[in-house]
C-alpha cells in the first residue's frame, strides 16, 4: 500500500518538502544565503532520504549556535556534504548517524558535518580535492564494492567557498576507516557578492 493511503499526513509533509527542496535547487546559485536557510534545505533533503531508506536507517542531529543562524554562507554547501555521508558512508545493515554543528570562531564561522560510517583511508583523503584526477577517489562499501563521486562533490563545495569567501577559507576532511568521517568548513572573514554579469 502506498504512503498516501497508509500515512497521508506524512505523505503530505514529504510532498511539501520535495516541492520546496526542488524549488530551491533551481534558484539562483550566485547569491549568498543564510546558514539557517542552508540548514532548512539540508533538513528537507534528509527528510526525503529518511523516507526512502526507512525509519531508523538515518539518524541526524543538528546543533547550530543561535548567534550564527543569520550568517551569510555560500548556497548549496550543506546538502552535498549530507548527500556524501548517505551515499558513501552507510554500512549495509547498521544505521548511519550524522551530526551537523556550526559555531562562531575567532576568524569567522565553522561548520562541521560528521558521520559514524565506514570512513576512508589516508590515501583517499589525500586526493579528495585534486582537480586533475581523471577518476574520482574510491570509497569502499561494506560489501567490498566501489563507489565514486565523493571527491567531485567536495571539490565543488570547495570551489563555491573560494568563490564567495576567497582562498583564506576552505575545507578539511578527517577520516578513519571503520570509524567515520568529519568534514570541516571554515568560512573566514567577510563574504563578497560576485559582480553581476553584463551583456
What residue ranges belong to the model's regions?
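Two-component histidine phosphotransfer core
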Residues: 1-172, 182, 186
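C-terminal end segment of the histidine kinase catalytic
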Residues: 173-199
Amino acid at each position: 500500500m502506498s504512503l498516501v493511503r497508509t500515512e497521508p499526513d506524512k505523505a503530505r509533509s514529504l510532498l511539501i518538502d520535495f516541492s520546496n527542496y526542488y524549488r530551491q535547487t533551481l534558484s539562483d546559485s550566485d547569491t549568498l544565503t543564510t546558514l539557517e536557510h542552508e540548514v532548512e534545505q539540508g533538513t528537507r533533503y534528509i527528510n526525503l532520504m529518511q523516507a526512502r531508506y526507512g525509519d531508523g536507517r538515518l539518524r541526524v542531529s543538528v546543533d547550530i549556535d543561535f548567534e550564527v543562524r543569520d550568517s551569510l554562507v555560500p548556497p548549496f554547501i550543506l546538502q552535498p556534504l549530507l548527500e556524501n555521508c548517505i551515499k558513501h558512508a552507510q554500512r549495509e545493515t547498521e544505521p548511519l548517524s550524522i551530526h551537523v554543528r556550526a559555531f562562531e570562531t575567532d576568524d569567522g564561522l565553522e561548520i562541521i558535518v560528521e558521520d559514524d560510517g565506514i570512513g576512508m583511508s589516508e590515501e583517499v583523503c589525500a586526493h579528495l580535492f585534486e582537480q586533475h584526477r581523471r577518476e574520482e577517489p574510491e570509497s569502499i562499501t561494506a560489501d567490498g564494492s566501489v563507489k565514486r563521486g565523493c571527491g567531485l562533490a567536495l571539490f565543488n563545495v570547495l570551489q563555491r567557498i573560494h568563490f564567495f569567501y576567497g582562498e583564506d577559507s576552505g575545507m578539511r576532511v578527517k577520516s578513519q576507516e571503520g570509524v567515520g568521517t568529519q568534514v570541516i568548513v571554515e568560512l573566514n572573514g567577510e563574504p563578497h557578492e560576485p559582480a553581476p554579469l553584463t551583456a
